Amino acid sequence: MRQNQLIEKVTAGQLRSDIPAFRAGDTVRVHALIVEGTRERVQIFEGVVIKRHGAGISATYTVRKISNGIGVERTFPLHSPRVEKIEVVRYGRVRRAKLYYLRERTGKSARIAERRRDK
């Protein structure tokens, strides 16, 4: 068995199946488990996905939000057990895979148009 096949076999059991389809430009609500002292609690981080990176077990995504007038970005592993769930709030229409230009934008220029979804 090749090394690549062995890695895929080991990580296949750790991949999550409850991840919704989302991409850059979508607004998501991430329910992340955080540890404060001895207790764990769920912290909700809601913002725009500015990038997705990688594939398989090492895939990540970065979410950006504005908190008290300051831009906050947080990168989450896609298949992390520390993320309880991911909710897609709205689907954005963008023409780029990486939305780094949103870092310089504020106010109305940072808005993203909603993608139309046919049912």
UniProtKB/Swiss-Prot annotation:
Q: Tell me, what is one Gene Ontology molecular-function annotation carried by this entry? A: structural constituent of ribosome
Question: Record's Gene Ontology CC terms?
Answer: cytosolic large ribosomal subunit
UniProt keyword Ribosomal protein, yes or no: yes
- Coiled coil regions in record: none
Under the heading Gene3D superfamilies, the entry gives: 2.30.30.790
Annotated GO biological process: translation
Q: Which UniProt keywords apply?
A: Ribonucleoprotein, Ribosomal protein
The record's Pfam families line, in alphabetical order, gives: Ribosomal_L19
InterPro entries per the record? Answer: Ribosomal_bL19 (IPR001857), Ribosomal_bL19_CS (IPR018257), Ribosomal_bL19_sf (IPR038657), Translation_prot_SH3-like_sf (IPR008991)
What this chain does, per the entry, is described as: This protein is located at the 30S-50S ribosomal subunit interface and may play a role in the structure and function of the aminoacyl-tRNA binding site.
- Name the family: Belongs to the bacterial ribosomal protein bL19 family.
- Write the protein's name: Large ribosomal subunit protein bL19
Tell me the organism. Answer: Limosilactobacillus fermentum (strain NBRC 3956 / LMG 18251)
The gene it comes from is rplS
